[in-house]
Amino acid sequence: MRTPTLARLPCRAVSGLTRSSARLQSQNFLTRRCASTAVLRSPTLAPAYQSALSKHFQQRRNASSTAAAVLEAAAANPDTLSQEAIIENLDPVEAARLSRVRNIGIAAHIDSGKTTCTERVLFYTGRIKAIHEVRGRDAVGAKMDSMDLEREKGITIQSAATFCDWVKKDAEGKEQKYHLNLIDTPGHIDFTIEVERALRVLDGAVMILCAVSGVQSQTITVDRQMRRYNVPRISFVNKMDRMGANPFKAVDQINKKLKIPAAAVQVPIGAEDEFEGVVDLLRMKAIYNRGPSGEELFETDEIPEKVKALAEERRQMLIETLADVDDEIAEIFLMEEVPTEDQIRQAIRRATINLKFTPVFMGSALANKSVQPMLDGVIDYLPNPSEVQNLALDKKRNEASVKLVPYNSLPMVGLAFKLEESNFGQLTYIRVYQGTLRKGSFVYNARNDKKVKIPRIVRMHSNEMEDVTEVGAGEICAVFGVECASGDTFTDGQLGYTMSSMFVPEPVISLSIKPKNNKDGANFSKAMARFQREDPTFRVTFDAESEQTLISGMGELHLEIYLERMRREYRVDCETGPPQVAYRETLGERVEFDHLLKKQSGGPGDYARVVGWMEPTGNLGENVFEEQIVGGSISEKFLFACEKGFHLSCDKGPLIGHKVLGTKMVINDGATHMTDSSEMAFKNATQQAFRKAFKESNPAVLEPIMKTVVTAPSEFQGDVIALLNKRNATINDSEVGVDEFTVYADCSLNGMFGISSHLRAATQGKGEYTMEFSHYERAPPHLQKDLIAKYQKAQADRHKK
């Protein structure tokens, strides 16, 4: 099939207007409007003007029909819109605009220097006038850490968006301006949803590693998230000025631990406190930073003698690694020729965008060294919006997969990826994948088909806003006045498209909570509603049995932050109970059942009989209900009631009242009564059969096992291992570095409560740890017995009341 052309479609470049330019545009519009009115009133000029106007609108209609034809062809056969076809056939003006846009995120392990690096990026691009440190003495804090809590604790809690322009010289020495949409993300696993939703809408990422620690636990998590959303990345080895810095250890760990081909594109000139700059391996030039804040770059062909041999060796390793992932370089390599600088650069770009390779840069953000070359790498090696494949599902065509085209003239498709409460109401962050989002326009929410107006569009600079009139394809913005949920798709109504949302992990820890003062009930409810809306991993439930409100999250720190925010932002002090683990229940073995529910009470009674079996599914994933009725002994509507009863039973297990995992129920026979059978009767019969069969199946209580990583100075290794053994942890691996060691272990969440204070005591405050949910496994028999007895006592006490 012939590839449909996208050329010649009219295009409107994205409006990144400042307030002054917006006012000027408005004045020009009024001037043109007055002039056009005068023309229309003129008897001699009106016909000519009307003819031109008619021709203009005809061109617009033709463009729209062409765009519609392109979409129609793509919907019928998505392969017609390959990324190559999109890039080749874009209108030159539109292609030029998109080629200068980069949507990137910065992600890494805790304290690898993400926010510090972002601060330098903003300074070197001219977005901010002065550098402020994360834990600076000036009490200002980094620009992207806008929350008071972030500045006090020195950590990033929520992702923050900004935009800036970076000027880079092309091959001919001409300066080209590139537009960057940048999102800084947290490093703590407790705030992993912030990383998830950022990577869901970004085209590329900078993965930062510590030059001393290399690949750490959260680096592996970030790598998994990048793979989930097919996000190309470049790597930046930060903290080259730290004692024990070894960037090539980090490169080796990317290859071995993350299993992605990687090679250095720079080598350091000096290290630790003698780190001076880097050597660019493509151009074989030494690069140094000068000026009070490293704002001036100095390049020279004179590479220091002490690193010449290393630079030659690493350049050859770069070419060899590329030969394994890129056909063009492989051919050159086999012919024993030397690729040119441009050939290497293009190969790195191809391999990076195709997720086959990551180039590794190095520097020190805190020391203001070698950040600008990393920015050049963002431009050179990360994709623009037209080079990334973004898919939507067409609900009008049985959810057929359709490629989205980052073209301003096509119908609008956008994804709401983050909600935030502000002084002006709900702020919704949207990535526009296709078409143009305009102020005052109407859009449709694909989830509920609601039509909403866009009253205001802003571009975010951390907690500051800049109003704009429109945002084009490939851009990120925020809008006010749009009620929606995180992950909702918006269209202009012409398309039935919906996009997949981001992955949301299940909470692993809960707390009972209530306001200390009953007068704070209204503010307490407002806070709970807002926090749930903003953060999908923060859950609020009400336990009818204990009559308690429970909040659930990703860890102790996660819930502590929300309790502190409630106190500061809503002036509500809360009482909390002890942490509660998200236990699960599961079936032990296959059990058959034949249950009859029969009640007579004078009038219509209840009658339902269900026959079948329950068995483990083989994995602790979703529960399965299956009907194998032959001969219609149970009608379809009663089977729906049986399925409902099964899922209700799985939501609250018979052992300790927690959710059930890995259970399958099959109903293959039953009986009904002409007058006494009902949907309610079959639902209740199924629940009763479930409870009885479950208890006969040798069931078990499951507890969450956490993947735990502890890092501390080497002299405390024995104390740390003893601390973990005391908590029944299974130690899987350990690494001993120059000054510190790392222990990798699996430990039950129940055993990890309160470890922070004990670890600080054991390591004189120098140890740190991270936890991430790994899997569920059977709890120890004594713990199962205690939990079941406690639950049964609570049930008995409740019935006495």
Swiss-Prot record:
GO molecular-function term, one example from the UniProt record: GTP binding
Biochemical pathway: Protein biosynthesis; polypeptide chain elongation
GO BP, sorted A to Z: mitochondrial translational elongation
Function text: Mitochondrial GTPase that catalyzes the GTP-dependent ribosomal translocation step during translation elongation. During this step, the ribosome changes from the pre-translocational (PRE) to the post-translocational (POST) state as the newly formed A-site-bound peptidyl-tRNA and P-site-bound deacylated tRNA move to the P and E sites, respectively. Catalyzes the coordinated movement of the two tRNA molecules, the mRNA and conformational changes in the ribosome.
UniProt domain tr-type G: residue ranges: 99-386
Localisation per UniProt entry: Mitochondrion
InterPro entries the record matches: EFG_II, EFG_III, EFG_III/V, EFG_IV, EFG_V-like, EFTu-like_2, G_TR_CS, P-loop_NTPase
Name recorded for this polypeptide: Elongation factor G, mitochondrial
Chain sites annotated for binding GTP: 108-115, 184-188, 238-241
Transit peptide interval: 1-62
Pfam family, one: EFG_C
GO CC field: mitochondrion
Swiss-Prot/TrEMBL keywords: Elongation factor, GTP-binding, Mitochondrion, Nucleotide-binding, Protein biosynthesis, Transit peptide
Record family assignment: Belongs to the TRAFAC class translation factor GTPase superfamily. Classic translation factor GTPase family. EF-G/EF-2 subfamily.
SMART domains noted in UniProt: EFG_C, EFG_IV
